Amino acid sequence: VELADRGGFDIDDDDYAKVVEQIITDEIGQGEGANLVVGRRYRAVVADWSAEKALTVFRRLLEREHGAYWTFLFFTGDRYLVGASPERHVSVHGGEVRMNPISGTFRLPKHVAAPDGAPAPDLKRDLLSFLADEKEIYELFMVVDEELKMMCDICHEGGQVLGPFLKPMSHLVHTEYLLAGRTRSDVREVLRDTMYAATVTGSPVENACRLIKEYEPHGRGYYGAALAILGRDPEGEPVLDSPIVIRTADVAPDGRLTVTAGATLVRDSDPAYEVAETHAKAGGILS
């Protein structure tokens, strides 16, 4: 699969860094939200795009992108969504509800192992430093708090928090929690009442969505939305399984490709670091 036009981000690195600075100063710093996920779009054109090319990309993701919750290829009728999402949005099996908020992001070096197979000498040190970083810790706490509120709304006994855990991917390592509870609600109501995840919007969610509209120049399309499988288990009980649509290429039939990548901004965010994070997230699907 080759690109006829390699394209680039709709907001360049310098301008995105300025947006990050503005949000930290004018919004988060003034109490308009605890954190905000602001995205930018990488646009390119795939040469001779077809259903066969879509299947090729899907196969490569299955082979190369380890740790995904869902690896998928979905055709809407007018565009292809092909991706490897690390994050479960929500699942329901036998009345058991699960959500997996993911936030902290550690970028793996290109060479994670030495020639003899031992870990790269700086990897352990850098990973431990990442795990002790207060900015990364608070970033995850904020989204867990917001999604736990959702769990309390849909689960009659409230929710349980398990973790934190590491979520290793091919290019990144994330930190995540597992939220668990029981519900009597219809699975369709569960899906509706958990939209949209704080991990792709911010918190509080309603205010974050208002700020996203203000700071992102275009609508998000399918980015941050949810795919879902709904059905029944062998006992006839309703089931739901839904990932968040991130790390996904949105490709039109003529080959126009869009990959949206966002960074979670908090008071202590470093603009240059957030710029690099969007490159790493987009790179997982573009490589």
Predicted segments, located by residue:
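Conserved hydrophobic core element of enzyme catalytic domains
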Residues: 178-287
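Short coil/turn segments at secondary-structure boundaries
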Residues: 34-40, 70-76, 189-190, 205-207, ...
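Active-site-proximal structural scaffolding
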Residues: 16, 51-54, 83, 90, ...
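Contiguous alpha-helical scaffold segments within structured protein domains
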Residues: 1-8, 45, 106, 110, ...
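An anion-binding catalytic pocket shared by soluble metabolic enzymes
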Residues: 37-137, 153, 230-261
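Non-catalytic accessory segments adjacent to catalytic cores
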Residues: 1-48, 52, 94, 136-138, ...
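Flexible, glycine/charged-enriched surface loops at secondary-structure junctions
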Residues: 33-35, 141-144, 219-223, 287
